[in-house]
Amino acid sequence: MNLKPLNDRVLVKRLESEEKTAGGLYIPDTAKEKPSRGEVVAAGPGKTADDGKLVAMTVKAGDMVLFNKYAGTEIKIDGVEHLVMREDDILAIIE
């Protein structure tokens, strides 16, 4: 499936959550929190400002980002979990 976000929407693929703690303990699936970082798969063209001009997106495909853990709408593409969210829900780009 090919998905192209509109306006200021971003398609993000979540990164896998940690399998074990820093101390070496394995975390069961039921106790894992969903990660709040991921990779931008696709981004829309941007949003239209009040004056009618297009405000370009800051993020682009391939960027690693940090986002609010309740951000976006979960969807599955070819069995892989993704999120569609607004660019405003992205807190930072990880460099």
Curated annotation (Swiss-Prot):
Cellular component, GO annotation: cytoplasm
Any coiled-coil regions, as ranges: none
GO terms for biological process, alphabetical: chaperone cofactor-dependent protein refolding
Pfam families the record matches: Cpn10
Cited InterPro entries: Chaperonin_GroES (IPR020818), Chaperonin_GroES_sf (IPR037124), Chaprnonin_Cpn10_CS (IPR018369), GroES-like_sf (IPR011032)
GO molecular function: ATP binding; metal ion binding; protein folding chaperone; protein-folding chaperone binding; unfolded protein binding
Primary localisation category: cytoplasm
Subcellular localization: Cytoplasm
Lineage top rank: taxon: Bacteria
CDD domains assigned: cpn10 (cd00320)
PROSITE patterns noted in UniProt: CHAPERONINS_CPN10
Keywords: Chaperone, Cytoplasm
PANTHER family hit by this protein: 10 KDA HEAT SHOCK PROTEIN, CO-CHAPERONIN GROES
NCBIfam families reported in the protein's UniProt record: PRK00364.1-2, PRK00364.1-5, PRK00364.2-2, PRK00364.2-4, PRK00364.2-5
Cited function: Together with the chaperonin GroEL, plays an essential role in assisting protein folding. The GroEL-GroES system forms a nano-cage that allows encapsulation of the non-native substrate proteins and provides a physical environment optimized to promote and accelerate protein folding. GroES binds to the apical surface of the GroEL ring, thereby capping the opening of the GroEL channel.
Family: Belongs to the GroES chaperonin family.
Subunit comment: Heptamer of 7 subunits arranged in a ring. Interacts with the chaperonin GroEL.
Protein name: Co-chaperonin GroES
Species for this entry: Nitratidesulfovibrio vulgaris (strain ATCC 29579 / DSM 644 / CCUG 34227 / NCIMB 8303 / VKM B-1760 / Hildenborough) (Desulfovibrio vulgaris)
Taxonomic path: Bacteria, Pseudomonadati, Thermodesulfobacteriota, Desulfovibrionia, Desulfovibrionales
Name of encoding gene: groES
